[in-house]
């Protein structure tokens, strides 16, 4: 049994990760500022420290005695990246995590697996985005993620901290708690359809995304922690399959057995046209790819939705 720290552990992915770790018999310690999470998302036997990763003393205390750190806390919602905040800055939290990981280990630094994002690729002409492509961030949130990756790389090379970054594509899945909410376009569309409201598509609807089921993303974090790298590593968390936003809307309407009005709005600044990942590096080194088919993941999400029981 191991003890793990999860920053942002009450959020969408963090809460699911904590539950999986606890189910496997591990001890879970969480830092969360409650800005996007709910207390009831914490694991029953876990330890919750309410605070922000920008608090260096809190992070240092939380890192003491842990066998690994999952860093998922963020100061900005990537789901609203178009509302670009020039002042958004996640680097202080990452620096606190890395410095504490360097100092907390008794024999060697604490391994860190952190959440990055496919938005670092920007609006790239490549139809299959691989990890060796240069970052082309279009928003401050994307630039933050790229900077965090560089900080992790330096920490690994200079201080021997095992760091693994996971570039998450479009993660979707059931909300971690009835009073919490999933983020992203899938949750937004599903909520609107079940409530009988219309759907708004920004742009022409032909923009594509690589949708990753939540349970698959969680498995990536756990597997990456079990395989601490000798060199700083980054992996796509993706299926390698693309689905257009209009196709997603049609799939959800069909799944729910409801027809709702679909309207178009102007494309948003910073919105990416095509985003589909190449899973080969993760397959080679982690033995993983996000394998849940979108239709299956949507059905599971609907079955667990508070308003979806009548349609499951």
Regions found by a protein language model. Give the residues of each.
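N-terminal Rossmann-like NAD(P)+-binding domain of SDR-like oxidoreductases, especially those catalyzing
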Residues: 1-168
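Amphipathic terminal alpha-helices
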Residues: 2, 294-312
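Active-site loop of classical SDR/Rossmann-like NAD(P)-dependent oxidoreductases
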Residues: 36-38, 245, 266-281
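Residue-level signal for the nucleotide or nucleotide-sugar donor/cofactor binding architecture
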Residues: 54, 89-92, 139, 143, ...
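Non-catalytic, hydrophobic alpha-helical segments
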Residues: 69, 217, 221, 237, ...
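Glycine/proline-rich active-site loop of Rossmann-fold NAD(P)-dependent oxidoreductases
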Residues: 146, 171-187, 197, 202, ...
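Hydrophobic alpha-helix immediately C-terminal to the catalytic Tyr-X-X-X-Lys motif of short-chain
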Residues: 147, 151, 155, 185, ...
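PAPS/PAP-binding and catalytic site of the sulfotransferase fold
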Residues: 244-256, 297-301
């Amino acid at each position: 049994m191991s003890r793990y720290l999860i920053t942002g552990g009450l959020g969408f992915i963090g809460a699911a990760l904590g539950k999986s770790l606890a189910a496997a018999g591990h001890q879970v310690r969480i830092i969360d500022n409650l800005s996007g999470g709910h207390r009831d998302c914490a694991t029953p036997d876990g330890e919750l420290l309410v605070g922000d990763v920008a608090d260096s003393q809190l992070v240092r205390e939380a890192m003491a005695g842990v066998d690994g750190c999952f860093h998922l806390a963020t100061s900005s919602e990537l789901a609203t990246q178009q509302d670009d905040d020039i002042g958004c800055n996640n680097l202080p939290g990452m620096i606190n995590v890395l410095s504490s990981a360097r100092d907390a280990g008794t024999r060697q630094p604490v391994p860190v697996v952190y959440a990055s994002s496919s938005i670092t690729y920007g609006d790239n002409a490549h139809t299959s985005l691989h990890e060796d492509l240069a970052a082309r961030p279009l928003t401050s949130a994307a630039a933050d993620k790229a900077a965090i990756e560089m900080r992790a790389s330096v920490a690994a090379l200079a201080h021997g901290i095992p760091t693994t970054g996971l570039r998450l594509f479009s993660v979707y899945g059931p909300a971690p708690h009835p009073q919490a909410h999933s983020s992203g376009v899938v949750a937004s569309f599903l909520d609107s359809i079940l409530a009988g409201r219309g759907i708004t598509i920004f742009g022409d609807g032909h923009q594509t995304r690589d949708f990753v089921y939540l349970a698959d993303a969680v498995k990536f974090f756990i597997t990456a922690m079990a395989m601490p790298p000798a060199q700083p590593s980054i992996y796509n968390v993706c299926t390698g399959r693309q689905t257009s936003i209009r196709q997603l809307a049609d799939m959800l309407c069909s799944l729910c057995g409801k027809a709702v009005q679909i309207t178009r709005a102007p494309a948003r600044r910073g919105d990416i046209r095509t985003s589909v990942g190449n899973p080969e590096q993760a397959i080679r080194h982690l033995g993983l790819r996000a394998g849940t088919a979108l239709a299956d993941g949507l059905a599971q999400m609907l079955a667990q939705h508070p308003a979806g029981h009548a349609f499951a």
